């Protein structure tokens, strides 16, 4: 199945007013007040601008308080970024994902779903967090601690309950709480992993960073970055994709009947429609701008007619990919995009084949201003044995 099939006519095959987005009503933007850039071409141009600098997502706080630590790859630019990116790229290639991590994805999915069937019910958002943390932890090298405990620690750090409001006092409280939770993450998860990799290096990110002379503080900030990108956001996407597929029997059937490429095409279209991170920030000449990924991914000149409808066979403009700008673009495009899509496909394919599986309760939809993205909680699944 092609990711970009051609319909028999240029006419929009569905209602022009149709809006399949489930997160639109919750979208609010991020913590920074900045002029918005909304068109697809303009947003992509800023993302590809080599003179633009990262902003938002605690960039200023981390760069200010990191002491002598190197900034994580998320905040590097130019030659420093290219050098570090090339050093870690081998952990995210399609071949490595297929040969090294697919078995882990399958085993983890099978274990989680066996528990769902045994218990008769579970929250999809909790299952997806454990799935995402397990896979990302293996790639990064955070394998010397309890996955369930690490999931809770990361969830506490990035959850909306961690947000304390606006203003100087709120910023101070946010920083203090963040430092405490960061120290717990280091003590429980990062420090044991560093010790194990020093004793016996493996093919993972922490071993690579140690070989490059990174200090424990350097590695902590890098793991924090991967914790957000590789774990928390993937958790939200798996839950969102599962919600769409469970509520639309015809889409579920299409997904289960598709080959691997066809399943990825459906997931990419869901991600285009529901980008997990709705706003990215950049420092450019003249100040800071807010890049509205949701608006850009709904730009009909780029993604085709009926931009708010879920249509895996939509015709896009040339050089516009399936997920649009949901994974970013330019030098900071998400390196783990293939991992996220692959593990989502593996997990959801197995989930949706469970006999008697039903969505008992649609999730609560919230908004996390720290990552400028939606949060889905209490998405209840049940398995009816009859």
What are these regions (language model features)?
Residues 1-386:
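Cytochrome P450
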């Amino acid at each position: 199945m092609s990711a970009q099939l051609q319909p028999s006519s240029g006419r929009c095959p569905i209602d022009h007013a149709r809006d399949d987005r489930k997160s639109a009503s919750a979208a609010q933007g991020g913590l920074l007040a900045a002029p918005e850039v909304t068109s697809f071409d303009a947003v992509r141009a800023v993302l590809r601008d080599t003179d633009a600098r990262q902003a938002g997502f605690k960039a200023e706080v981390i760069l200010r308080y990191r002491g002598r630590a190197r900034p994580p790859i998320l905040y590097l630019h130019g030659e420093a970024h290219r050098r570090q990116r090339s050093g870690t790229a081998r952990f995210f290639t399609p071949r490595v994902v297929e040969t090294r991590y697919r078995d882990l994805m399958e085993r983890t999915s099978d274990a989680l779903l066996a528990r769902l069937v045994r218990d008769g019910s579970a929250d999809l958002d909790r299952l997806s967090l454990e799935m995402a943390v397990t896979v990302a932890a293996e790639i990064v090298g955070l394998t010397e601690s309890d996955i369930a405990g690490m999931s809770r620690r990361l969830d506490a750090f990035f959850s909306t309950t961690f947000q304390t409001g606006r203003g100087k006092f709120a910023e101070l409280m946010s920083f203090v709480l963040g430092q405490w939770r960061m120290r717990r993450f280091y003590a429980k998860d990062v420090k044991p992993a560093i010790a194990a990799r020093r004793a016996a290096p493996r093919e993972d990110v922490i071993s690579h960073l140690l070989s490059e002379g990174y200090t424990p503080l350097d590695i902590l900030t890098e793991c924090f970055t991967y914790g957000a990108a590789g774990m928390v956001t993937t958790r939200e996407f798996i839950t969102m994709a599962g919600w769409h597929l469970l509520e639309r029997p015809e889409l579920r059937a299409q997904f289960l009947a598709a080959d691997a490429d066809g399943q990825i095409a459906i997931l990419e279209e869901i991600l285009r429609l529901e980008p997990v991170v709705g706003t990215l920030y950049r420092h450019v000449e003249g100040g800071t701008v807010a890049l509205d990924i949701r608006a850009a991914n709904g730009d009909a000149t780029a993604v085709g007619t009926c931009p708010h409808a879920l249509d895996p066979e939509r015709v896009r403009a040339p050089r516009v990919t399936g997920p649009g700008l949901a994974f970013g673009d330019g030098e900071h495009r998400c390196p783990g995009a293939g991992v996220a899509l692959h593990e989502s496909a593996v997990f959801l394919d197995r989930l949706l084949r469970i006999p008697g599986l039903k969505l008992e309760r649609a999730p609560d939809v919230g908004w996390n201003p720290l990552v400028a993205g939606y949060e889905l909680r209490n998405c209840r699944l049940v398995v009816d044995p009859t």
